[in-house]
Amino acid sequence: MIIVTGGAGFIGSNIVKALNNIGYKDILVVDNLKDGTKFVNLVDLDIADYMDKEDFVASIVAGDDMGDIDAIFHEGACSSTTEWDGKYMMDNNYQYSKDILHFCLDRGIPFLYASSAATYGGRTDNFIEDRQYEQPLNVYGYSKFLFDQYVREILPQADSQICGFRYFNVYGPREGHKGSMASVAFHLNNQINAGENPKLFSGSENFKRDFIYVGDVADVNLWFWQNGVSGIFNCGTGRAESFQAVADAVVDFHQSGPVEYIEFPEKLKGRYQAYTQADLTNLRAAGYDKPFKTVAEGVKEYLTWLNRSV
């Protein structure tokens, strides 16, 4: 059995899909379906069982026998960069991760988990998996950063796989439940379908991010599991592309426009990553050599999926 926490969420459900694609269906999805809309991410997937997150935490803390587990993909977290309840964030993203990590270490179970490029904070270069380059801007980034530090202390003595992925700007199918935290491509597509012009913040040609397609993220997770590699790795394309490029790809798909520009929100100033670009040196050195989709390629595939029944 494989366990995927956050398995009804965005990246988690795409990992479940990737596992299904290689014939793996003995999957336990762990999630919190208080937001019932997330069920749609699972309806076309094959899983063996579902477990509520609170029940799962209680079970692993109690040390319950959950049978043979081939791996745990830990994608469950609060991923809102605008959430400022630090206790909630640390319980969800830090303590929960530690509980699962020790459950895996005690049983020799491969543990692959979601970290984040938010650990790098507001820097504009050297997005390298090293402490000197890490300075998160918000409590979400701090929760991910602190768990990475915790893992770094344990890695040298660990007898089983521990692998963290610093996700950059992930976009693609199954993110609709994320609301305001969904990708720019998702929101621009909705605006056009509602008969509006797509909207970007003023200066979006200067805001550049490393946008990575969620199918590529799932491929990275499966490859590292299948190859037993441990460490903390950036998971991006190694390219910085502008929000304008995303808008151009959406407009090109719909053959509509023009793009409207709106004022940059005051509340985001100083807490917004204006530039990200993954350094893939360590990822490539580990042996992962597959190419990553460009924004133009990924957005086209995503919008084809999003608009399949429109």
Curated annotation (Swiss-Prot):
Binding positions (NADP(+)): 10-11, 31-32, 38, 53, 75-79, 92, 144, 170, 178
Record keywords, A-Z: Carbohydrate metabolism, Isomerase, NADP
Record's protein name: ADP-L-glycero-D-manno-heptose-6-epimerase
Superkingdom as given in the UniProt entry: Bacteria
Function: Catalyzes the interconversion between ADP-D-glycero-beta-D-manno-heptose and ADP-L-glycero-beta-D-manno-heptose via an epimerization at carbon 6 of the heptose.
Catalytic residues of the enzyme: Y140, K178
Keyword NADP: yes
Catalysed reactions, as listed in the record: ADP-D-glycero-beta-D-manno-heptose = ADP-L-glycero-beta-D-manno-heptose
Segments forming a coiled coil: none
Species of provenance: Yersinia enterocolitica serotype O:8 / biotype 1B (strain NCTC 13174 / 8081)
Subunit and partners: Homopentamer.
